Regions:
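Tubulin/FtsZ superfamily GTPase core signature
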Residues: 1-226
Length: 226
C-alpha cells in the first residue's frame, strides 16, 4: 500500500469483504465481487466518451474532470432507484408531485451510493469528490442535480465537488459517487499501525531501541517494494 501510494496519483480502495455472500461457493463469490467492483465505473467512463448527441448531458463529466478529482486514497460507490416505464399514455407534463418524487429518487440513489462505498470511510475527510447522475432523459431535471449536489456537500463539506449528468439509462436513476484525497481511512491506518508494531517487535528482539512516535512520524519506517 505504501509503495503504491508513493508512486500513483490515486488509489481506489475496495474492501472485498463488503461484497462477500455467506454460504456461497468461493468461485461464485469472486465472480460476484469482481462484477460489483467494476460496475460503478461503467457510466463514469462512458459519459465523457459519448458520441451520440441524444445521450450527451447538459453538464458533461469527462476524463479531465475525473483526473482533477482523483488524488491519494479514493473510494467509489453507486446507488440506484428504479424508474417506472413511460408508455404512450403516460403524462407528458409533470406536476409538482411528480418532480418531488423524482427528486426523492435521486436522494435515495445518492444515499445508497454513500452507503455502498467500496470501503467504509467518513465523507467529511474527503478533499475532492464528484457525482454523476445517469437516468432516462425524461427523469432528469435541474432540481434533482442541485439536490444531489447539496446532499453531497452536506456529507463532504470540505471537498471540492465536480458533477455531471448522463441521459442514457432506461430503467433506473443511478448515482455514482467518488470521494478522493481522503486524509484519514481507518482500515489503512490500522494496517500501517500493525506494520509499525511488527517493526517495533522485530527491533526489540534484535536489541534495538524503537521510540514511540506518532503514525505520521513513523511512516518512513515502513519499507517499500520499489
Amino acid at each position: 500500500l505504501k509503495s503504491a501510494y508513493l508512486m500513483a496519483d490515486a488509489i481506489f480502495l475496495i474492501d472485498n469483504q463488503r461484497y462477500v455472500k455467506k454460504n456461497a461457493p468461493i468461485m461464485n463469490n469472486m465472480a460476484a465481487i469482481n462484477a460489483r467492483v467494476v460496475e460503478p465505473f461503467y457510466n463514469l467512463l462512458c459519459a465523457g466518451e459519448e458520441t451520440s448527441q441524444k445521450y450527451i448531458g447538459s453538464k458533461i463529466l469527462d476524463a479531465g474532470d475525473i483526473i482533477q478529482t482523483l488524488a491519494g486514497w479514493t473510494i467509489i460507490g453507486q446507488g440506484k432507484s428504479p424508474t417506472p416505464p413511460r408508455g404512450f399514455f403516460s403524462k407528458e407534463k409533470h406536476d409538482f408531485r411528480d418532480r418531488m418524487t423524482e427528486t426523492s429518487k435521486g436522494t435515495h440513489a445518492m444515499d445508497e451510493a454513500l452507503g455502498e462505498l467500496s470501503l467504509t470511510c467518513e465523507p467529511k475527510d474527503a478533499g475532492r469528490a464528484l457525482y454523476l447522475l445517469t437516468a432516462p432523459p425524461k427523469e432528469m431535471n435541474m432540481e434533482i442535480i442541485k439536490e444531489l449536489g447539496d446532499n453531497l456537500k452536506a456529507m463532504a463539506p470540505n471537498a471540492l465537488i465536480r458533477s455531471g449528468d448522463y441521459p442514457r439509462q432506461k430503467s433506473s436513476l443511478d448515482v455514482t459517487v467518488i470521494l478522493s484525497e481522503l486524509n484519514s481511512v481507518r482500515k489503512i491506518t490500522n494496517y500501517f499501525t500493525k506494520a509499525l508494531d511488527l517493526i517495533s517487535m522485530i527491533k526489540a528482539k534484535q536489541g534495538l531501541e524503537y521510540s514511540s512516535r506518532k503514525l505520521e512520524e513513523t511512516f518512513s519506517d515502513i519499507p517499500v517494494l520499489l
